[in-house]
Amino acid sequence: MKNYVIQRRYAKALLLIGKEDNNAEQYKEELNGFVSVLDMEKAFESAITNPLYPVEARRKVLDMVIEKLGVSVMMRSFLALLFEKRRIQHVRGINEVYQNLVDELKGIVRADVVSAGELSDDVVEKIRASLSKMTGKQVIVDIAQDPTLIGGIVTKVGDMVLDGSIKTQLSNMKESLKKGERV
């Protein structure tokens, strides 16, 4: 929980600056680009977060990568601040929170849909339209498959989970039968 509080605090601060100078979307792309480099180059992440390396050496590595990425002065300052405050290891979480905040600002919500099998484009579009109607926002749907669901889908939008999987229905029936209830 503590990490989320830290991540949200920095993400909200960056969003305030982004709203103020109308560069929130640019910062979203730059921060996401930096996190992509971390994901691709594990040695880079270790070089900037490992306390066994001297601070100045870590700073030089960070500065070189930031320079190569060609990010804005604001993003350069933001990443330097994270480094100075020893929060650079939270940059992935900050990025995730920031992406969601910018999407929220633009009236976009992300939905994770997990199905037992592959969904046709028509079905995905119907799910998207229905979620959009329900939330009143534009919905971006991320699809995943999980054969253990047996059938149906599980949809997660923010904190709300809609579980229409056969696996859950069977589990609920099993519990009802154990309790001696009618199904």
Curated annotation (Swiss-Prot):
It comes from the Bacteria. Gene3D superfamilies: N-terminal domain of the delta subunit of the F1F0-ATP synthase (1.10.520.20). It is found in: Cell inner membrane. It is a peripheral membrane protein. Pfam families: OSCP (PF00213). The keyword Metal-binding does not apply. Belongs to the ATPase delta chain family. HAMAP family: ATP_synth_delta_bact. F(1)F(0) ATP synthase produces ATP from ADP in the presence of a proton or sodium gradient. F-type ATPases consist of two structural domains, F(1) containing the extramembraneous catalytic core and F(0) containing the membrane proton channel, linked together by a central stalk and a peripheral stalk. During catalysis, ATP synthesis in the catalytic domain of F(1) is coupled via a rotary mechanism of the central stalk subunits to proton translocation. F-type ATPases have 2 components, F(1) - the catalytic core - and F(0) - the membrane proton channel. F(1) has five subunits: alpha(3), beta(3), gamma(1), delta(1), epsilon(1). F(0) has three main subunits: a(1), b(2) and c(10-14). The alpha and beta chains form an alternating ring which encloses part of the gamma chain. F(1) is attached to F(0) by a central stalk formed by the gamma and epsilon chains, while a peripheral stalk is formed by the delta and b chains. PANTHER family: ATP SYNTHASE DELTA CHAIN (PTHR11910). This is ATP synthase subunit delta.
